[in-house]
């Protein structure tokens, strides 16, 4: 190659190499700058991720409602998430009742070396894992212990600014707002998600009610206590129905200080499980008012609805059995959990069940104020098909039922013309209140002619089921038994016969078979099918057709508690009683 050409070629190559080096340098510089910016963003601007372990949905829901910072992300974690603890900027642990094994405890301890961790209320000293300094721990603990929207809001701001060290959208947290120990509380009508308003006297509370249009002279009044439900949801439901609600924060002080004597309470509703105590039982005896115990399923509503068991033994005992020692009634699911916009579980009042519960309480209150002569009572008794007798362990059912009717008459109830004796009542039950097997066509024909059954039309049944049953249950009945009225207890003109004996304002009804088939024992003790039309119709006729004020199951247990999805807490799903 000619020397001049070689020189020009080498010069060109040198220029290219310089350009490449410059590009490489600029690229490296860009990487360094971008890396620095990313690091700076992560350190000063990025999202603060806070994990909560072993937190109750009620508390976590309150913390979630307090978070208005888009740069703070809250997450609920379980032991299944322990492999990803390093993904968070702060871990807060509720140590009360925390159950972790040695390996899980080691994982949490190791994570605390990298991630600031605070455990509070640890019942096991080994679980008291804290890696923030004493000053920060003390400040955060004060926010947690005092609770409320303001304190939780400040706690989250404190974590972002001082624990996570962020500069962007990191406001100065407010000082701890010490929570006063109020006697009564009420949600703020102007800010329902905010902190509850507190009152230390009936006079203060009544003034608040009057100012907000909630004081109603002569209205039914309830005392609402306990902390396992969404209190504002229940308060609003009762107030919408015309009740005056006294939300009691310190029940024992409220009673011992005779504040309760200043109001004419018609009922007490306790949202907590377990016992209230002997002092409260004495109070209830003096006032002669009922105690209601709405249930919180403490899990997602969707999970509960698909679970045939519904509640396990221990939780059922605390929520249903133990409150009954105090005389609690109506253990009915009102509260469940749902996923909120932050992806966290929160407690809420299930709307249709809340409405049903409030209606039931109102029914009890109205019943007490109603004259005995006007009260309407439906009494369901259990007997086998055909000539089988009414049964109950250790009880002569028909004589006992007759004695009840006589007692009702003596108490001023309208029972019309009663039979002369228990034997006559037994004959009437066999003729008018029998339970028929699907095989007893001849006896059923005779019953239609002389048994004086109530007849339910397709239009009535459709209206009643839409009020009382879930769409799922209606669909299952239609699929299993065809179009109304089906084949069992049906008339030729498309009506459904309901066996009953009516004595004035008291009606006796047999609890008909809860399924179809020849094995009556199995049907009584639980089938995995929707109950037939006639089973549902007898209860809905008592409720809507007869307009019963009260319903009594008389004698041995029947099949209601074994019908599909009715384990104590699901009767509204089954829809056959109220």
Model region roles, listed by residue range:
Residues 2-578:
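An N-terminal assembly and electron-transfer interface module characteristic of large anaerobic redox
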């Amino acid at each position: 190659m000619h020397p001049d050409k070689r020189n020009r070629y080498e010069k060109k190559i040198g220029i290219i190499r310089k350009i490449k080096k410059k590009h490489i340098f600029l690229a490296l510089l860009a990487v360094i700058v971008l890396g620095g910016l990313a690091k700076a963003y992560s350190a000063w601007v990025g999202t603060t991720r806070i994990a909560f372990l072993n937190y109750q949905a009620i508390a976590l829901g309150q913390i979630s409602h307090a978070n208005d910072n888009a740069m703070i992300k809250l997450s609920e974690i379980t032991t299944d998430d322990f492999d990803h603890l390093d993904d968070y900027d702060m871990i807060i642990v509720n140590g009360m009742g925390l159950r972790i094994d040695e390996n899980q405890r080691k994982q949490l301890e190791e994570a605390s070396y990298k991630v600031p961790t605070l455990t509070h209320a640890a019942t096991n000293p080994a679980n008291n894992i804290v890696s923030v300094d004493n000053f920060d721990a003390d400040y955060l603990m004060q926010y947690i212990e005092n609770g409320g929207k303001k304190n939780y809001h400040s706690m989250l701001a404190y974590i972002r600014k001082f624990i996570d060290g962020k500069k962007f959208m990191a406001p100065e947290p407010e000082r701890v707002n010490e929570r006063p120990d109020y006697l009564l509380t009420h949600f703020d009508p102007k800010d329902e998600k905010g902190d509850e308003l507190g009152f230390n006297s009936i006079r203060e509370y009544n003034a608040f009610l009057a100012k907000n249009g909630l004081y109603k002279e002569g209205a039914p009044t309830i005392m609402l206590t306990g902390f396992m439900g969404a209190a504002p949801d229940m308060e609003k439901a009762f107030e919408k129905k015309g009740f005056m609600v006294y939300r009691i924060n310190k029940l024992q002080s409220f009673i011992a200080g005779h504040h309760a004597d200043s109001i004419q309470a018609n009922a007490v509703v306790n949202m907590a499980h377990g016992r209230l105590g002997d002092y409260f039982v004495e109070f209830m005896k003096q006032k002669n008012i009922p105690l209601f115990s709405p249930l919180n399923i403490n899990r997602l509503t969707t999970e509960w609805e698909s679970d045939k068991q519904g509640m396990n033994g221990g939780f059922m005992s605390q929520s249903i059995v133990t409150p009954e020692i105090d005389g609690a009634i109506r253990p009915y699911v009102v509260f469940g959990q749902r996923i909120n916009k932050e992806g966290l579980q929160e407690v809420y009042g299930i709307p249709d069940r809340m409405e049903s519960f409030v209606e039931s309480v109102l029914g009890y209150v109205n019943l007490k104020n109603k004259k005995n002569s006007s009260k309407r009572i439906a009494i369901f008794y259990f007997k086998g098909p055909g000539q089988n007798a009414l049964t109950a362990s250790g009880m002569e059912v028909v004589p006992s039922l007759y004695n009840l009717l006589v007692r009702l008459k003596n108490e001023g109830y309208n029972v019309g013309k009663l039979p002369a004796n228990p034997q006559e009542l037994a004959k009437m039950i066999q003729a008018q209140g029998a339970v028929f097997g699907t095989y007893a066509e001849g006896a059923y024909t005779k019953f239609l002619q002389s048994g004086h059954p109530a007849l339910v039309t397709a239009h009535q049944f459709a209206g009643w089921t839409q009020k009382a049953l879930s769409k799922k249950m209606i669909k299952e009945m239609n699929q299993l038994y065809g179009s109304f009225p089906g084949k069992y207890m049906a008339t030729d003109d498309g009506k459904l016969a309901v066996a009953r004996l009516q004595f004035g304002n008291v009606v006796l009804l047999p609890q008909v078979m809860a399924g179809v088939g020849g094995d009556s024992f199995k049907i009584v003790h639980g089938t995995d099918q929707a109950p037939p039309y006639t089973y549902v119709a007898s209860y809905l006729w008592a409720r809507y057709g007869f307009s019963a004020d009260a319903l009594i199951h008389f004698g041995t247990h029947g099949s209601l508690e074994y019908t599909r999805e009715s384990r104590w807490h699901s009767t509204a799903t089954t829809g056959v009683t109220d």
